[in-house]
């Protein structure tokens, strides 16, 4: 049965105290509390620096066995080197990521909007990155392109050949293409009218739920993350979409204020 994992991009937001976290919840327990509400999160800090192994170990100690961390790949790989001569930093990133063990989810490669399509370069990277050591479980890779030139049939075919997913990213700033290229679907909701700041309406989320249900019926695992973290919109929208997808009520929890 396909997995349905809906969560938010990150959890350590100070302005979520009150709207989401109880007022008496210390910051060190945010993840533990978050993991009672959601089955997954997308880690953004890994984009800026390589987390320590001890950090990953601390995280896994705070979440249930089935909890999943999706990791945003280092900007050294996607922005600075732009997939050129990245064998060493890629291996370092992946080796560290595997400390998460069963909790490791997809790895998101978010490319800058100034990075135009270079299919041969992407092909060389995927050929190497999607070939793990025999003893390692396969990785789920996701590509979020932000330049229009990447959205072509040739690029989709390349992703499909390597089992990598095209990130379906909803935002007011960058192109969106609802194209499935892998056995799983990866969606990022950045905010429809304001990047990172606007909330989705119930009507908008109902429409999104329809096509996501079709993807699930086709056997695709679903990873869905809300990146509109301002004022707690992400948690509200994540719960609404989950309710629409699963036909369930939100579970009752003790908290100061409601989301």
Enumerate the language-model features and the residues they cover.
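Residues lining hydrophobic/aromatic ligand-binding pockets adjacent to catalytic sites
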Residues: 1-259
């Amino acid at each position: 049965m396909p997995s349905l994992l809906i969560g938010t991009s990150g959890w350590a937001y100070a302005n979520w105290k009150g709207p989401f976290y109880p007022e008496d919840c210390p910051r060190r327990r945010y993840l533990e509390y978050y993991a009672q509400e959601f089955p997954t999160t997308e880690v953004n800090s890994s984009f800026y620096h390589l987390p320590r192994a001890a950090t990953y170990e601390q995280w896994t100690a705070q979440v249930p066995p089935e909890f999943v961390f999706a990791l945003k790949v280092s900007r050294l790989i996607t922005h600075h080197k732009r997939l050129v001569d990245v064998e060493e930093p890629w291996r370092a990133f992946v080796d560290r990521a595997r400390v998460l063990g069963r909790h490791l989810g997809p790895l998101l490669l978010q490319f800058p909007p100034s990075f135009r399509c270079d299919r041969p370069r992407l092909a060389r990277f995927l050929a190497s990155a999607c070939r793990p050591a025999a003893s390692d479980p396969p990785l789920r890779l996701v590509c979020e392109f932000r330049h229009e030139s990447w959205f072509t049939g040739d690029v989709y075919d390349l992703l499909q050949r390597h089992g990598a997913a095209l990130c379906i990213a909803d935002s007011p700033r960058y192109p969106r293409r609802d194209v499935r290229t892998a056995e799983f679907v990866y969606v990022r909701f950045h905010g429809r009218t304001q990047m990172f700041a606007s909330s989705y309406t119930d009507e908008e989320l109902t429409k999104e739920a329809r096509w996501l249900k079709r993807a699930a019926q086709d056997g695709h695992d679903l990873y869905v993350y809300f990146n509109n973290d301002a004022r707690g919109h992400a948690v509200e929208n994540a719960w609404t979409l989950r309710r629409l997808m699963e036909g369930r009520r939100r579970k009752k929890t003790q908290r100061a204020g409601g989301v």
